[in-house]
Structure formats: C-alpha cells, structure tokens
C-alpha cells in the first residue's frame, strides 16, 4: 500500500512532465510551420504566375480564332452558293429515229440528242418550278459535238421511256400541236389557224383511239430559216412565204400503214395480207382544238364531230374526205 502523499507527488510530477513536453511540441509546430508556409506560398505564387499569362494568352488567341472561324464560315457559305449556281444540270439521252436524222443534213448523222435538264427544288412552289429555262442541247454528229440553244419548260421531274418509233412520232405530234395551238390562241383569227392542222389517218375502217400513227412531212411552199432541232424546240416549226398570212405556222401529217398485233397473226396468210393492203388508202381528216377538246372537222360542210365514225357517216362524205 502506498501512501497518499506518494501518490500525490507522483501525479504532480507527471503533470509537470506533461507541461514540459507540451511547450516542446508547440515549439516544433512553430518551427515546422515556417518551413511549410514558404513552400505553399511558392506553389501558390508559381501557380498564379503560370495562370495569369495563360489567361492572357488564351484571351489573345481566342480573338484570331473567332475571326478565322467566321472567315471559314463565310467561305463555306460562298462556296455552297457558287456550287448551287454552277451546278451542272442532268443529261437525258433521247434516241432519234433514222427518218428524222435524214432531215438533219447540216449536222450529218446524229446518234442521239442530249437535253440538259434542270434540277427541280421540290420545296419551291409550282409557279417557280414551271418557269422556262434557256439551256443548250448537244447534237453528236460524226463524233463532233455541236451546241444548239433550245428552250423548254419543266414542271416536275420526268422520264422518257421510248420503246418504238410510233411512240416517238406520237410524242412529237402532241408536243408540236400543243405548242401551235397555244400560239394560235394569241392570234385573232384562231379558227383559221386551227384549221391548218391536217392529219391523214391510217386504216379508217378499223380506226380506234388507241391505235393510230402519224408521220411529219415537209409542207408545200415553205422556207426553213433555222435547223430542225431549233425549229422544234423554239415553237416556230416553219415560216410561210405568203406575206398575207404572216407568221402562220402549219404542220402537215401523212398516213402510214400500221398493223396491230391481231393483224400480225394473219400476215402469214396471203389473203389476210392482201386485205390489209386493200383497205389502206389515204383519207384526209382535219382535227381542230376547241374548248370542249379535240374535234373532227369536215372541210366540205364545216361541221364538227366528236368521233371519226360520225364524220364518216354524215351526209357529205366523199372518197377524198
């Protein structure tokens, strides 16, 4: 058993030792803190030094970069506009039959006709899409391209699936007649101009609206001032030498022998072939355009008929009609 006096002295001695140790620890902290603070200050100063010039340089570099970006954007926009303006149109190859090639004496033997088609923007309204475009047509003659200016109108994108010469002739007839009748509406004497369109129908005894064929021939007393391609595309097919009928245009059509698919089967029989040739005679018919559509016009009595059967059965029929 220890006495309370010894225990009190021990506790007092421990407290004194602790009090002596505490100042030593404080001194170490005081000594270590100055050594740590300069490092922190140096790092902070170096970071601030490194950051301040960097911010200045980044601000200085941002200005030319923004200017360069704006210049690149403007150049890209200009290039896109120039590409849209200088965009080459599409090429459409249209085969030409030999009968039409023979008329092109000044161009020689042409292989095909290239028509430049304009790309149509579907976002634009129809009024803007249906405008006339003046482009060029390339006629390849003897491997030498010859440029011809043509004028055409496009409303929508289209294809031309040519199968035979019959479809080509019917297309030419439709295009020319539509162009002529549109010009005739501007004239005062429209009936006189419309009556100049004479068509000779093939096989009148077995005529149907689905089977007919026509061939263009040169009108009489007519002088051609321009080549065939330019006349067909510009709307002025020919010009008459008669000064009284100034700027009156005519398209004369002749009949040809057309044999249907049913009649082809009877060609092996001689009698059937003779019957086809026997009834193949020329019959002149005048077709005019009215507000109600196409009509058959009788040049003798001046009456109009809706069908060819009515024209044949009326009272003033004759072998030459």
From Swiss-Prot:
Output the InterPro entries linked to this UniProt entry: Znf_C2H2_type (IPR013087)
Q: Where is this region: Disordered?
A: 1-83
Q: Where do Polar residues bias regions lie? A: 21-32, 44-60
Protein name stated in the entry = CPX chromosomal region candidate gene 1 protein homolog
Naturally occurring in which organism (per UniProt):
Macaca fascicularis (Crab-eating macaque)
Taxonomic lineage from the root = Eukaryota, Metazoa, Chordata, Craniata, Vertebrata
């Amino acid at each position: 058993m220890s006495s309370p006096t010894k225990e009190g002295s021990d506790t007092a001695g421990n407290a004194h030792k602790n009090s002596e140790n505490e100042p030593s620890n404080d001194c170490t902290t005081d000594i270590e803190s100055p050594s740590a603070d300069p490092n922190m200050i140096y790092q902070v100063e170096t970071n601030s030094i490194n950051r301040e010039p960097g911010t200045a340089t980044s601000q200085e570099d941002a200005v030319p970069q923004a200017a360069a970006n704006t210049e690149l954007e403007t150049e890209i926009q200009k290039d896109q506009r120039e590409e849209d303006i200088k965009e080459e149109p599409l090429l459409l190859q249209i085969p030409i039959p030999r009968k039409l090639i023979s008329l092109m004496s000044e161009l020689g033997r042409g292989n095909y006709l290239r028509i430049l088609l304009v790309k149509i923007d579907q976002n634009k309204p129809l009024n803007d899409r249906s405008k006339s475009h003046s482009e060029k047509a390339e006629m390849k003659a003897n491997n030498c391209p010859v440029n011809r200016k043509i004028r055409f109108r496009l409303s929508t994108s289209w294809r031309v699936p040519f199968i035979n010469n019959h479809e080509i002739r019917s297309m030419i007839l439709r295009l020319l007649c539509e162009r002529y009748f549109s010009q005739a509406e501007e004239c005062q004497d429209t009936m006189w101009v419309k009556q100049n369109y004479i068509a000779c129908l093939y096989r009148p005894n077995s005529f149907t609206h689905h089977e007919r064929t026509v061939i263009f021939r040169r009108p009489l007393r007519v002088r051609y001032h321009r080549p065939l391609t330019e006349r067909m595309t510009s709307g002025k097919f020919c010009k008459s030498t008669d000064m009284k009928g100034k700027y009156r245009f005519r398209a004369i059509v002749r009949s040809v022998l057309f044999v249907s698919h049913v009649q082809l089967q009877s060609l092996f029989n001689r009698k059937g072939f003779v019957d086809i040739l026997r009834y193949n005679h020329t019959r002149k018919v005048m077709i005019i355009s009215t507000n109600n559509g196409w009509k058959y016009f009788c040049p003798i009595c001046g009456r109009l008929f809706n069908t060819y059967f009515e024209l044949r059965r009326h009272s003033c029929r004759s072998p030459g009609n």
